[in-house]
Swiss-Prot record:
GO biological process: glycogen biosynthetic process
UniProt-recorded name of the protein: Glycogen synthase
Keyword Transferase tagged: yes
Family affiliation: Belongs to the glycosyltransferase 1 family. Bacterial/plant glycogen synthase subfamily.
Domain of life of the source: Bacteria
Pathway(s) annotated for this protein in UniProt: Glycan biosynthesis; glycogen biosynthesis
Entry's EC annotation: 2.4.1.21
Organism: Thermosipho melanesiensis (strain DSM 12029 / CIP 104789 / BI429)
Keywords assigned: Glycogen biosynthesis, Glycosyltransferase, Transferase
Length: 481
C-alpha cells in the first residue's frame, strides 16, 4: 500500500503546532506497519535551516489550469530516523515567508500547493493508493481529483483521506479565487464549496474526500453537533458514515523520561523518586522556593479562550491560595499574558509565568510537575495531556474531544484511571477538579503512587494510531470504482 502524507508543516522541517508532530511521526510507524509512505510539503524558508542533504530533483514545472505563470521546483530528502522520502514543492513567490502560515496570499498559496502536489506525483511517476491530506490548506486536493483529474488514468485508482486537526480553521475566502483555481463553476453552490457567499476549502475536502477523520473519537462526534460544528455540522452529518476518529499518538523515542536529554534527571517507574529531583531543579531555575513536597501544577498552552483561560481566570487566585506552585509556559492573547505576569508579581513564591515558547523548558515542566492543567473549551485531540501522562504527571482536564478519550477519572475503589476532570464548562467545576487532585496528592499517597503508575502505563503510542490509519486507508481503497 502506497500512501502520500500531505501537509503544510512536518517536524523537524517546519513546526508551528501539533500537526507537524503528527505528520513527522506517523510515516515512521506506517513504515513499520508495511505501508510505503512518502511525505509532501511546501519548501518554506525555514526548511533550508532544518533539512539536511536537500537535493533538487526537478525544476520549472508549470500547472496548466491555474491562472498563473508561476512554476515550481521539487526537492527531496529523507525523514529523519526513517527510510521515508519527503518531497518539497518550492516556489519563491508563494513559500518565501519567514513563517509557515504567512505569504502574499494564503488562498492562492494553498490552491497552488494543492495543484502542485498532484502535478508532482505525476511528473515523478509516484502512483499512490491513498493521498492523506491534512486540514484546509490541502483540502482542495480531493476536489481536484474528483473534477479536473477525474478522467486522468494516472489517478484512476487513487483515493483520499482527509484528517481534520481543528475544525475551527476552515480556509474561508472570497469567491474570486474560483477563477484562479481553475475548478469548474458548478462547484460554487450550497452543495459544493460555496459557504455563505464565499468559498470554504475545508468544506470541499469534507464533501469530496473518500474517508474523513478527526484526531479523536469524541471530537468526531462533537463536530456533528451545532455546539462544536462551526457551521459545518450539517455537512459532517451528511458524511457521518465516512467520518471516524483516530487518536494521535506520541513518539515514544522522542518523549521518553528514561532517555530525554532535555530534562534535568532521567527516570522511570522503577526510580520515580528521581522525578522529584526534576521538580527541585526546575524550582531553582525558575526562582521558586525549593521544596519537593509543594504540589506543582504545570500548564503549557496557547493563551487563548479555547484553552479554557476564561474560566481559569475566574479561579486562578483560589488555586494559587491552595499553597501550590503554578508554572505556565505559552504565548497568546495579551490579556492572558498580562494576567499571568500580574499573578507572578502578586504571588512570586507560587507563580512562574513564562510568556514565550521554549521546547526545552516545556520538557522540564512535563517532567517536574505533579499535575498538568488543560481546562479546554474544546480540544480536537490534545498532546499536552499525552506528554504529561508519559512523564507521570497527572492531568486535570475538561472532558472534551481527545481529553475525554485519553484521561480516565481516577476511581478510588477500583484504583483505575489516570487523572481528574470535569464535564461542564464552568470555573467552579474546574476548581473542584483541582481540589480533588490536590487532596489525593497531599492526603492519599498510596493512590497518588497508583495514579502515576496508571498514567505511565497508558498506551499512547503511534503504533496503535498507525494501525487505525491503515484500517482507514483500506476503507478508502474499498471505495475504488
Amino acid at each position: 500500500m502506497k500512501v502520500a502524507l500531505i501537509s503544510y508543516e512536518v517536524y523537524p522541517f517546519a513546526k508551528v503546532g501539533g500537526l507537524a508532530d503528527v505528520v513527522g511521526a506517523l510515516p515512521k510507524y506506517l513504515e513499520k506497519a508495511s505501508v510505503k509512505p512518502i511525505v509532501i510539503m511546501p519548501k518554506h524558508k525555514v526548511v533550508e535551516k532544518n533539512a539536511r542533504n536537500l537535493d533538487k530533483v526537478m525544476e520549472k514545472i508549470s500547472i496548466p489550469y491555474l491562472k498563473t505563470d508561476e512554476t515550481f521546483d521539487i526537492y527531496k530528502t529523507i525523514v529523519p530516523k526513517t527510510n521515508v522520502p519527503i518531497y518539497f514543492v518550492a516556489n519563491e513567490y508563494y513559500f518565501s515567508a519567514e513563517n509557515v502560515y504567512e505569504g502574499p496570499d494564503l488562498a492562492e498559496q494553498a490552491i497552488y500547493f494543492s495543484a502542485a502536489v498532484l502535478e508532482t506525483l505525476k511528473v515523478l511517476d509516484l502512483q499512490m493508493d491513498v493521498l492523506h491530506v491534512n486540514d484546509w490548506q490541502t483540502s482542495l486536493i480531493p476536489v481536484y481529483l474528483k473534477t479536473l483529474y477525474k478522467e486522468d488514468e494516472f489517478y484512476a485508482k487513487t483515493v483520499t483521506l482527509l484528517t481534520i486537526h481543528n475544525l475551527g480553521y476552515q480556509g474561508i475566502f472570497d469567491s474570486k479565487y474560483m477563477e484562479f483555481s481553475g475548478l469548474p463553476n458548478y462547484l460554487y453552490n450550497i452543495d459544493g464549496i460555496e459557504f455563505y457567499g464565499k468559498i470554504n476549502f475545508l468544506k470541499g475536502g469534507i464533501l469530496y474526500s473518500d474517508i474523513i477523520n478527526t484526531v479523536s473519537p469524541t471530537y468526531a462526534n462533537e463536530i456533528q453537533t451545532k455546539e462544536y460544528g462551526e457551521k459545518l455540522d450539517g455537512v459532517l452529518r451528511l458524511r457521518s458514515a465516512d467520518l471516524y476518529g483516530v487518536l494521535n499518538g506520541i513518539d515514544y523515542d522522542e518523549y521518553n523520561p528514561e532517555t530525554d536529554k532535555r530534562i534535568f534527571v532521567n527516570y522511570s517507574l522503577d526510580n520515580i523518586d528521581k522525578k522529584y529531583e526534576n521538580k527541585v531543579r526546575l524550582q531553582k531555575e525558575l526562582g521558586l522556593p525549593e521544596d519537593r513536597r509543594i504540589p506543582m501544577i504545570g500548564m503549557i498552552t496557547r493563551l487563548v479562550d479555547q484553552k479554557g483561560l476564561d474560566i481559569l481566570s475566574e479561579v486562578l487566585r483560589y488555586i494559587v491560595n491552595y499553597d501550590i506552585q503554578f508554572v505556565i509556559l505559552g504565548t497568546g492573547d495579551e490579556k492572558y499574558e498580562e494576567m499571568f505576569k500580574k499573578a507572578q508579581q502578586e504571588f512570586p513564591k507560587n507563580v512562574s509565568a513564562n510568556v514565550k515558547f521554549d521546547i526545552n523548558l516545556a520538557q522540564k515542566i512535563y517532567a517536574a510537575s505533579d499535575m498538568f492543567l488543560m481546562p479546554s473549551r474544546y480540544e480536537p485531540c490534545g498532546l499536552g495531556q499525552m506528554y504529561s501522562l508519559r512523564y507521570g504527571t497527572i492531568p486535570i482536564v475538561r472532558y472534551t474531544g481527545g481529553l475525554a478519550d485519553t484521561v480516565l477519572e481516577y476511581d478510588e475503589n477500583k484504583m483505575t484511571g489516570n487523572g481528574f476532570g470535569f464535564v461542564e464548562y464552568d470555573s467552579s467545576k474546574l476548581l473542584k477538579a483541582v481540589a480533588r487532585a490536590l487532596d489525593f496528592y497531599k492526603n492519599k499517597k498510596v493512590h497518588w503512587k497508583k495514579l502515576i503508575d496508571n498514567a505511565m502505563k497508558t498506551d499512547l503510542s503511534w503504533e496503535r494510531s498507525a494501525k487505525e490509519y491503515v484500517k482507514l486507508y483500506n476503507k478508502a481503497m474499498s471505495k475504488r470504482i
